[in-house]
Amino acid sequence: MGIAMPIGPHLMMWVCNRYNLTSKNVWIAYGGSYPGALTAWIRVKYPHLVYGSIASSAPVQAVENFIGYNEVVHASLSAPIVGGSEECAANVAAAFATIDKLIETQEGVTSITEKFNTCAPVTTANDTLTFVSNLSNNFQETVQYNLEIPGSPTIMDICSYMTNSASDPVTNLAALTEKLYSKGACMDNSYAASNAGLMNIVRA
């Protein structure tokens, strides 16, 4: 739960005292995704302080190998109403299926290193997971924020890459990744570096 849970009650009590709030001034917690889970938990843990919570898309129970969100991503990539198509979703699936096979051989790893301009060859199991996770983020974040952030890629944008008939799905994915992720720099897929960044709680 991190530091947010224990800090929350202290902050609420401080605000109540600072502004002379009473029991008629109720607290409602709001959140979506991980913050949504926090809003649900804080209501359960501190019912005497939090009157209610609105927890949107809140994963309050850990599930191993959770694929639910990727199913939502696939559905969005398939939906013309948001800029997707069946061809787009199929090509994305084909690209990842091919990558799964490529990482099993040295020749395939060399191909991935060159196509995706990785900073180092993807060889360890953890670095491979980080690599695939980085690729997945292209689609997950785009679906989550589709048409919400000005200037950010949309589902239509990424599908225009993935449905380019002049290239194969993996090459299209590499071009998309270069555009959205690496932007000319090498692609860092170090599991150790990724974890170090997550553990730095004082980063800006």
Q: Can you describe what each PLM-predicted range is?
A:
Residues 1-19:
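Alpha/beta-hydrolase active-site loop
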Residues 3-4, 31, 199:
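Short amphipathic alpha-helical molecular recognition features
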Residues 15, 37-40:
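Eukaryotic intrinsically disordered and solvent-exposed regulatory patches
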Residues 16-22, 51-52:
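Substrate-binding/catalytic groove segments of enzymes
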Residues 21-34, 38:
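Alpha/beta-hydrolase fold nucleophile elbow
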Residues 41-204:
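Alpha/beta-hydrolase
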